[in-house]
Amino acid sequence: MAVKIRLARFGAKKRPFYRIVVADSRAPRDGRFIERIGQYDPMLPKDNKNRVVVKADRLKHWLSVGAQATERVMWFIKKGIVDLETESKKIEKKKVEKVQGQEA
């Protein structure tokens, strides 16, 4: 089963609203999904913090277990809208501090 992280379209006609979901690649675009990990509202202004909302820990989990992100979701990640690197740097920093504390 190939798992994809993709956008599912909701909302009214000419008022799109997207949910960022983890779904089987064979499932319909707006159909059955495994987990909802965020949302994207293109109708909000670009500087609005609620335009793209993602559970970064769940996104990171699904990417680590082999889920493939679609082109648009990867664009969000590369643009820095979804900040995965900051989360991983915080975790690494805590691990380094913990190891140094044990050695001392």
Curated annotation (Swiss-Prot):
The entry's keywords: Ribonucleoprotein, Ribosomal protein
Gene Ontology MF annotations: structural constituent of ribosome
Transmembrane segments: none
An annotated GO BP: translation
Matches recorded under PROSITE patterns: RIBOSOMAL_S16 (PS00732)
One cellular component term from this protein's GO annotations in UniProt: small ribosomal subunit
Keyword Ribonucleoprotein: yes
Superkingdom field: Bacteria
A Pfam family that the UniProt record links to this protein: Ribosomal_S16
Cysteine pairs bridged by disulfides in the record: none
Record InterPro entries: Ribosomal_bS16 (IPR000307), Ribosomal_bS16_CS (IPR020592), Ribosomal_bS16_dom_sf (IPR023803)
Family: Belongs to the bacterial ribosomal protein bS16 family.
Protein's recorded name: Small ribosomal subunit protein bS16
Gene: rpsP
